[in-house]
């Protein structure tokens, strides 16, 4: 069952799957409001890449 038909479910899924930050040094997943990496304490964070079809 595709979730692209229901915009509310799609918004929930997109927030759950793409709303976090990735450390550029070690690749760890961090919360979206993180200032430093939880694993290596680096400040070199980026948002999760999102490619919409």
Curated annotation (Swiss-Prot):
One of its GO terms (biological process) is translation. HAMAP family: Ribosomal_eL40. This is Large ribosomal subunit protein eL40. GO terms for molecular function: structural constituent of ribosome. One of its GO terms (cellular component) is ribonucleoprotein complex. The keyword Ribonucleoprotein applies. It holds the Pfam family Ribosomal_L40e. Keywords: Ribonucleoprotein, Ribosomal protein. The keyword DNA-binding does not apply. It comes from Pyrobaculum calidifontis (strain DSM 21063 / JCM 11548 / VA1). Belongs to the eukaryotic ribosomal protein eL40 family. The lineage of its organism: Archaea, Thermoproteota, Thermoprotei, Thermoproteales, Thermoproteaceae. InterPro entries: Ribosomal_eL40_arc, Ribosomal_eL40_dom, Ribosomal_eL40_sf, Ribosomal_zn-bd.
């Amino acid at each position: 069952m595709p979730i692209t038909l229901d915009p509310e479910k799609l918004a929930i899924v997109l927030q759950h799957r793409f709303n976090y930050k990735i450390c550029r040094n070690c690749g760890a997943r961090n919360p979206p409001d993180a200032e430093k990496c939880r694993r290596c304490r680096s400040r070199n964070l980026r948002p999760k890449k999102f490619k919409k079809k």
